[in-house]
């Protein structure tokens, strides 16, 4: 059965706290989806963000973002007093997230809530900590050490802590016990609010699509705690890093800088790290979008010393063997493959063998720089795909029309029969809604008729990304 949904980051929801949260605005958004006949709410990754604020570079593949914890909901359960958070200036612009301001002020408020949490609900919190110990022990110590060392990445910590020597680790845990309890308590609060929201979504018939980045940030508890799973030397420095080769959009390619997986080691231990990660994500989400699917067929490896991505080479990924292992653990759970970018016949074959739906982005259909644009035109869509006007990495529909080349826009207007009476953004959404694609997802900004001011992210740029927020009303 064909179905539709909306891509809306939680951070972009309106709220008085400088950023969207898991509270009232999220519940009201679920009401909107249900009342408008939608089936899916697609999110961006919801992990704790660091420098650059990208949800695709979180400090942990497991932890939730503390910024998303709703403060009013904490007050309702007696963990905060209104005067402890309501008089604080949380933002300077209601249409943008000020991450620097949140970093300065939010943790001071959460500290009060966590202190009360441990005092009043110790047994429940300890039970949570025991259940989540696989990742929570490392994450809470990682964040405590990071705070102690002034936010510096773990590769700049003392050698004995970088290498996780037993005696130094034990000493750090003892000396930082109060900080560790804080970070554990924050995760308890996040998970509690998330589970309530997820239950409400289920009751309203809304399925949540989560987003799992293929790579993890070097400065993360994942890499610090599981360095053997990555391509690193004896001093724990990456030997090769991730990125994309040069193409029509970037002459130098893209140098992402994430450490690459040691697929040989992962295959030898049955992909345990990955299988645990995916199983965990299905506790959060009904559907998983796996970012950079082509990297499982072949990945682009760039020497860590390289200045641009031009020096990289293609290396074989784990292929179908990996996805067969995933299926054995999670069963036939719904997975969306992000199959955009440079694709080869072997990538297409891997997608076919998995049976996962791929992605079709309408804005790519009219780009004169890409000879493969026709595959993104709706009359060429297979049924087993997810159709988008644009994703978080694209401009909004109206933004694309105002910034794309005149030739591309003219082609789109002719092909889609766009006009000002219907609204060109609505015409582009109509195209994917009326296509043969089984799933159609539109960005909230396109429903609101926003131009480039509503763009979430511009790849290969620093600053100004991940900040867009919807205004109340």
Feature-to-residue mapping (PLM):
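Surface-exposed amphipathic alpha-helices with a cationic face
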Residues: 34, 194-204, 327, 351-352
